[in-house]
Amino acid sequence: MALAVGLMSTTAIAQSPAASSPTVHPTPQSMQLDLEKMFHTRSPWRLVVIEGMPVKDYGENDAPGALTLCLQRGPTGPCLSDPVTPPLRAPTPDYAIAWEPHYLLTAKVVYPQGPKAAPLLLLVTGSLNSGDGDQIVATQLLDYDSGHDEFRRVYRKSTGHNNNQEIRFIADGPLRGSVITAEPQEHPPYGYWIVVNTLSRAGAYRQVLRYRSATRYNDGNTLAVIDSEMPNIERQLGLWKPGEPLPTPSAGDGKPCIKPTLRHSALWCE
């Protein structure tokens, strides 16, 4: 399974291994995002991102400084970091590296139930790269609670990317608003755990599907794991059945998938 290409597509906003290479971010990442108009907040909320001084990553490459993310209620209000700062995660409990965010990969408003429904704030951040080029990428989704005039985290997940892991928010199509994750299995035949979370009526994400992939690690498929598994995902959720047109993602190089086909239940682009 080849690495996915690009951070965003027209159908999905994805955590992309190719977008997370150990390079210095080309432009300063400090920014502010006005949330008042898009969320119709009672107070003038905004997302604030502050970038620290440049550092070296764990491969001794130049890297951007640590990011401080917070939500500020007006220009003079306190900046609250807890709602947008997930707990730090290391590969193992005894691992010394702190995986604080250094790369702002995505900060935008998304519409899981269409443009006329309530939006969510999507944040994707990446840690420093380790010596082997791996990186912890954290994905968060937040909604706005008008009754309490505050933002709350409704989804949080982090993973690496060296083994084709991915966390993807689906922006449109039959799975619109879902979050799909692909993470490698630790034992033969070395496929992936595919997990689908959907937004419930209560406003929180809940798991609706988990299964072992038909896709295998290093199988030569140019598609991202989630794309190659899309027929299986949609079939198990009752959104697609054999005989209907196959889902047609990009072919892995930004070009349309002209001839989608199934091989051992996984989607390939010929």
What feature does the model see in each segment?
Residues 71-117:
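Short N-terminal edge-element motif at the start of the domain
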Residues 14-46, 50-64, 70, 165-270:
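Acidic, small-residue rich beta-repeat scaffolds with periodic aromatic anchors
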Residues 1-9:
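Bacterial N-terminal signal peptides
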